[in-house]
Design a protein with these regions (language model features):
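Long, low-complexity, mixed-charge
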Residues: 1-50
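Conserved beta-strand/loop scaffold segments within soluble protein domains that form the structured core
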Residues: 30-271
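Catalytic-core signal marking the mid-to-C-terminal active-site face
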Residues: 277-279
Length: 279
């Protein structure tokens, strides 16, 4: 099977030095042989909002692609659970449309088996007073690419993301989060944490972009990375862009290993270093 084609994903909105290899990611893909699994559309309204929406998807053998569209009506409080898995190469593109004062609690579990690849693209557009609270967990042993783009279009709209991952073996984990602030008094909070062991590789790109007109808006992002192997590779790219004066943007990262005091605590209780790292 020809996999010489490359898809460019997880792009930074503004490019940085090419030699850092963080401007985007490329994934091998055979467009001609990709199975189109169609589009599923959902409408969450006042009548059905009490029942959480469950979306469980497994990719087909080889290359496959799926589209999801979710419309959340004005004033509705929606909950969506998504579980994505594959033994091949699977691309899932999900678009959320939130109307005035709608809220969405989104829980995503992204998984891929050995030698498999999952690309999950999640877009959200928030009207005035609308908001998304996303929890995303990246697990499994295959390569995982998570691409998240949120438009805070309306005043007082908001977005929060809690992202967790565990990289192991020779796995690649590549996460991109872009939040575009358009409306006034908009807020976002991005909190990412995870651990890398063996020879795992991880890239996290977090972009908060304050557009003209987004005055009195606030954006915060942070990442915590635990390094559990000499061969792991970690790249963290926090980015704050600003075209508006009266805004607040903060970013930070904590990257380190288990300290000697913690290891001594475990070893004094008969727990080896390897067991402590797994804990």
């Amino acid at each position: 099977m020809n996999t010489s084609e490359q898809l460019v994903v997880n792009k930074l909105p503004t490019r940085t030095w090419n030699h850092l290899n963080v401007n985007e990611a490329t994934i091998p893909w055979n467009v001609a042989d990709t199975a189109d699994l169609g589009t599923d559309s959902y409408a969450i309204t006042a009548e059905n909002q009490a029942q959480p929406l469950h979306i469980d998807l497994t990719g087909a053998a080889g290359f496959s692609r799926k589209h999801i569209a979710v419309d959340v009506a004005a004033g509705v409080q929606a909950t969506v659970y998504m579980v994505l898995d594959t033994q091949g190469s699977f691309a899932v593109e999900t678009a959320f449309k939130l109307h005035d004062a709608a809220s969405l609690r989104l829980v995503q579990v992204l998984g891929a088996q050995d030698s498999a690849l999952l690309y999950a693209k999640t877009d959200a557009d928030c009207a005035p007073g609308a908001g998304v609270d996303m929890t995303q967990i990246l697990m499994g042993r295959g390569d995982l690419y998570s691409d998240n783009d949120t438009e805070l279009s309306g005043a007082a709209s908001h977005y929060s993301a809690q992202i967790g991952y565990l990289g192991r073996g020779s796995q690649t984990i590549d996460v991109n989060v872009v939040v575009n602030h358009y409306g006034k008094n908009t807020e976002c909070e991005i909190d990412t944490s995870g651990a890398l062991k063996d020879a795992a590789k991880k890239v996290f790109r977090g972009t908060i972009d304050f557009k003209t007109g987004s005055s009195n808006s606030v954006g915060n992002e942070k990442e915590t990375v635990l390094m559990l192997g000499d061969d792991v590779i970690n790249k963290t790219v926090p980015l704050i862009l600003c075209a508006e004066e009266n805004v607040v943007g903060n970013h930070g990262a904590t990257i380190g290993e288990l300290d000697d005091e913690t290891l001594f605590y475990f070893e004094s209780r008969g727990i080896s270093r390897a067991q402590a790292e797994n804990i």
